[in-house]
């Protein structure tokens, strides 16, 4: 995964196989520095003071605090079952962490590094993005919650109000949507883009090479109306 820091002047890349966070040159051509961790890096964010916060994989996941310039580790704490994403929010002045196998969103005070709030969200939250002037978080959950006998069967996205600390709404992706990987929001906070699969579970199991069973998809969410807009099939 790629992450920007220092107002877009610094580029970081996660190397999951090597359990590393790598700082690249601004043009992305050279490796300037790398930090090694005990488990694969899932995500990072930067707070208002320039510190970097990194969450790493594992049943007993870890959150690291790094000096923004030297990239030296300042502290580390245990942080739930597989913290999958982390985001600093300037309105709440806190860190928000999706806890994949806790099915929760945690708010953490960066000064004390203690959990302030736990919010129940969908099944296996894996990614998030801020919108509406940083007042809301869009949480992308990995799997559908409903039983396999239900209709439709699809992943739902959670919208969390940062100040009230409550789920303010949900958006369901098209029938068959599963295995969500990431979510991103445009600079105007008008649309969100979600990458996932659409499972063709109502079709016979043939022509697998044509994506008949699992098709890579990009779904677009209208953040003003707070509803699903359309989906683009990426496989041919």
Question: What are these model-derived regions, one by one?
Answer:
Residues 5-8, 46-49, 89-92, 131-134, ...:
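Residue-level detector of Asp-centered blade-edge/turn motifs that repeat once per structural unit
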Residues 140-154, 194-215:
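Short, conserved, GDST-rich strand-edge loop motifs in beta-rich repeat architectures
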Residues 25-29, 67-71, 109-113, 161-165, ...:
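Short loop/turn segments that connect beta-strands within beta-propeller blades
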Residues 1-20, 42-43:
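Beta-strand-rich domains and repeat architectures in extracellular enzymes and scaffolds
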Residues 167-176, 226-236:
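Surface-exposed loop and turn segments in beta-propeller and other repeat-based domains
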Residues 10-12, 51-54, 94-96, 137-138, ...:
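Conserved beta-propeller blade signature
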Residues 17, 58, 101, 143, ...:
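Residue-level signature of beta-propeller blades and closely related beta-rich strand-turn architectures
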């Amino acid at each position: 995964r790629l992450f920007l820091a220092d107002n877009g002047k610094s580029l970081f890349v996660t190397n999951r196989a090597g359990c590393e966070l790598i700082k690249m040159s601004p043009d992305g051509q050279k490796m300037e520095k790398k930090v090694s961790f005990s488990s694969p890096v899932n995500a990072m964010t930067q707070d208002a003071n320039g510190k970097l916060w990194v969450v790493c994989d594992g049943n007993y996941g870890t959150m690291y605090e790094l000096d923004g310039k030297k990239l030296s580790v300042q502290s580390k704490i245990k942080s739930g079952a597989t913290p999958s994403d982390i985001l600093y929010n300037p309105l709440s002045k806190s860190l928000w962490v999706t806890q994949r196998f806790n099915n929760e969103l945690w708010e953490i005070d960066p000064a004390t590094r203690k959990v302030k709030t736990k919010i129940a969200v969908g099944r296996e939250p894996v990614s998030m993005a801020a919108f509406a002037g940083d007042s809301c978080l869009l949480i992308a959950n990995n799997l559908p919650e409903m039983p396999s006998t239900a209709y439709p069967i699809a992943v739902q996205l959670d919208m969390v109000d940062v100040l009230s600390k409550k789920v303010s709404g949900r958006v369901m992706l098209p029938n068959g949507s599963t295995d969500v990987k990431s979510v991103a929001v445009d600079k105007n906070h008008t649309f969100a883009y979600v990458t996932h699969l659409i499972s063709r579970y109502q079709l016979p199991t043939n022509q697998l090479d044509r994506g008949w069973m699992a098709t890579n998809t990009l779904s677009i969410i209208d953040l003003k109306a707070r509803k699903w807009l359309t989906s683009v099939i990426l496989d041919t």
